[in-house]
């Protein structure tokens, strides 16, 4: 009895242990999944006062105007002639096999079909020979079944727009008709290599001895054997011709895609690499090098086709392939390609935004030289994933010392005394309740701006079925996909981001100079935080095209310089303001006034004197309203266009915000405040530039 109870108790304990173990495992897996999931997308805060941030995207090298050309010929004269002979022999022998039972039958139109396949490719290639050959290919022939054992899977149409004879020959990748004709007519002694020509004479020559043998041994008694052997030979010739037709189709298709592979059976990237390596020293003696560095390891993304351009022409019945490649100077310096991103400096409802002169630039490792890079560099340059770089046309490097370029000076960590003239600083309103996201690297890295509140971010990664909810603190930062993956990130109901980082060679890196630009060194952010303006636009996003359209420029110097007991007029405030009126001191005219009206003239002079004083003190005639907080009190400056006066509003601390005090003119304001050592107001100068 006791043994039975002990056994039950032991079983109960074991079940409890198993249950606890299962729960612990589930919790562990859940925790691990959460940690791994959170590591997939990272959120890194940055200082929003930096003005600009610099993202290294790729390497950058410059190619010369020189190039190297490989030439490969494919002669189809022999096979086209042989196909005509095969057709006539099939017709001849087919009439003699009626009495033989073991002779293989060949459809008479098979040779015509293969011939049509070849001619169909030739007719769409640009002719280099003035004596043009016109091929008339019957569509009914091409629509029949191709009677060979080679599968064809081509979806390309017959229009080969890659062969444009009107291309400009200035770029290494261009090869016009005139270029091709000149090269064939008078080949250069260097930087051109003719590869072995592919001939089609084997279709007839390799069977010649065997055919002579069976013909010489032909007798009446072995007539059926002769016919069987001859039909087998003709069928083998047709198989060879069909293989050549397939080779041509492959060559044409690969030229269209600008990618050679061994499926064409004659030439591929490995063949080119072998020939290039043989010529390395020869080029080096000419102060030139290949794009490929044979001393470096080739990564899994290496693709030689990114460093060549294929061109296909035809000269009578000979197809000619030209493979053009760029050349670099052996002394060429490598650059790092950076993208410049504006970091919004937002306080209250207003943002200050530095716009760089160039969105992209390249700079050497030593940081001694830089080159501007076009916004369209992806079209102007060639990406080479083998080294995670772009190959661009040669550009003269510029010294970074005293560049007087905003983004370069900030990249070098140098402060300028003339920020207003060197940098383009725009001002805009924004919605502090909205979340903003700017793309740094397509589908992989973003700059986020979450102004005032913590944001809940939800993302789901499809490849690992990972779903994560995370909280991101308010501020500015970088959102980054840490691995090759596809995800969907939802930040708010109207902001969704797609992540696809599977095809990136390496991570981009954010660069911060040791001495970063800091808006706080120029601007009192507490004053800016309470400033509001109604005349500048509100932006929906902070992308570069939107920022370039902002019509108002912010002047740091005017903002940080304190007034000397008056509001200095700025002529840049002329959006819709009335023009200034010239005033003249008419005090000298009083000496000629008649004595009987002296009292009246004196009174008028006094009024004129008071008017000039008011105009001098209140010298901003525009419709701008600027509010800010100083010493815990709101001060409102309002300029009226009609009477050209500045007004100050000092609400009582016990008054409601919705019931402001009446405005009092500056003229009636206590002059002791203006004489205080600590100025009560800072001017905010905003220029309309568009």
UniProtKB/Swiss-Prot annotation:
Keywords linked to the UniProt accession: Signal, Virion
Signal peptide (from-to): 1-37
Disulfide bond positions: none
Pfam families membership: Baculo_F
Keyword Signal attributed: yes
Parts of the chain that traverse the membrane: none
Entry GO CC: virion component
Name used for this protein in its record: Protein AC23
Organism: Autographa californica nuclear polyhedrosis virus
Record lineage: Viruses, Viruses incertae sedis, Naldaviricetes, Lefavirales, Baculoviridae
């Amino acid at each position: 009895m006791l043994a039975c109870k002990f056994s039950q108790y032991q079983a109960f304990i074991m079940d409890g242990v198993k249950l606890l173990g299962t729960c612990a495992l589930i919790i562990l897996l859940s925790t691990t999944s959460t940690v791994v999931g959170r590591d997939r997308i990272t959120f890194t805060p940055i200082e929003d006062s930096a003005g600009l941030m610099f993202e290294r995207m790729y390497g950058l090298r410059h190619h010369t105007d020189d190039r190297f050309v490989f030439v490969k010929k494919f002669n189809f004269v022999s096979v086209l002639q042989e196909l005509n002979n095969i057709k006539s022999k099939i017709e001849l022998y087919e009439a003699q096999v009626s009495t033989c039972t073991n002779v293989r039958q060949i459809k008479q139109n098979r040779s015509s079909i293969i011939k049509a396949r070849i001619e169909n490719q030739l007719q769409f290639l640009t002719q280099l020979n003035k004596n043009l050959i016109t091929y008339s290919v019957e569509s009914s022939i091409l629509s029949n079944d191709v009677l060979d054992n080679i599968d064809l899977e081509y979806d390309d149409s017959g229009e080969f727009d890659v062969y444009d004879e009107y291309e400009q020959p200035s770029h290494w990748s261009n090869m016009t008709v005139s270029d091709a004709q000149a090269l064939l007519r008078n080949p250069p002694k260097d930087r051109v290599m003719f590869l072995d020509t592919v001939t089609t004479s084997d279709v007839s020559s390799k069977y010649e001895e065997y055919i002579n043998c069976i013909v010489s041994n032909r007798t009446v008694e072995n007539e059926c054997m002769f016919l069987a052997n001859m039909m087998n030979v003709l069928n083998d010739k047709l198989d060879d011709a069909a293989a050549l037709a397939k080779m041509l189709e492959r060559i044409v298709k690969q030229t269209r895609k600008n990618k050679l592979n061994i499926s064409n059976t004659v030439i591929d990237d490995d063949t080119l690499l072998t020939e290039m390596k043989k010529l390395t020293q020869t080029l080096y003696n000419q102060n030139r090098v290949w794009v490929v560095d044979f001393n470096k390891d080739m990564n899994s993304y290496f693709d030689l086709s990114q460093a060549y351009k294929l061109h296909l022409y035809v000269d009578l019945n000979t197809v000619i392939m030209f493979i053009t490649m760029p050349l670099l100077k052996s002394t060429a310096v490598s650059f790092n390609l950076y993208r410049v991103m504006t970091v919004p400096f937002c306080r209250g409802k207003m943002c200050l935004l530095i716009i760089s002169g160039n969105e992209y630039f390249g700079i050497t490792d030593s940081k001694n030289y830089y080159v501007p890079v076009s916004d369209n560099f992806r079209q102007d340059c060639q990406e080479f994933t083998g080294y995670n770089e772009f190959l661009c046309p040669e550009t003269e490097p510029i010294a970074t010392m005293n560049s007087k370029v905003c983004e370069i000076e900030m990249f070098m960590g140098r402060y300028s005394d003339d920020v207003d003239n060197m940098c383009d600083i725009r001002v805009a309103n924004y919605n502090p309740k909205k979340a903003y996201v700017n793309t740094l690297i397509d589908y992989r890295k973003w700059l986020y701006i979450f102004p005032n509140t913590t944001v809940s971010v939800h993302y789901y990664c499809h490849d690992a079925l990972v779903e994560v909810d995370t909280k991101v603190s308010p501020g500015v930062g970088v959102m980054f996909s840490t691995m090759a993956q596809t995800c969907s990130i939802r930040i708010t109901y109207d902001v969704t981001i797609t992540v696809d980082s599977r095809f990136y060679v390496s991570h981009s890196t954010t660069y911060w100079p040791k001495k970063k630009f800091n808006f706080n060194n120029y601007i009192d952010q507490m004053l800016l935080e309470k400033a509001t303006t109604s005349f500048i636009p509100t932006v929906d996003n902070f992308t570069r095209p939107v920022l370039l359209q902002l019509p108002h420029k912010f002047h740091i110097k005017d903002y940080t310089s304190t007034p000397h007991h008056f509001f200095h007029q700025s002529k840049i405030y002329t959006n819709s303001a009335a023009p200034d009126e010239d005033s003249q001191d008419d005090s000298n005219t009083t000496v000629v006034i008649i004595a009987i009206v002296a009292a009246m003239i004196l009174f008028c002079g006094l009024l004129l004197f008071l008017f000039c004083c008011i105009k001098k003190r209140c010298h901003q005639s525009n419709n701008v309203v600027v509010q800010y907080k100083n010493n815990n009190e709101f001060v409102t400056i309002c300029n009226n266009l009609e009477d050209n006066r500045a007004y100050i509003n000092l609400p009582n601390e016990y008054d409601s915000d919705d019931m402001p005090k009446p405005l009092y003119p500056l003229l009636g304001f206590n002059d002791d405040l203006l004489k205080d050592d600590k100025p009560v107001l800072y001017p905010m100068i905003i220029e309309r530039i568009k």
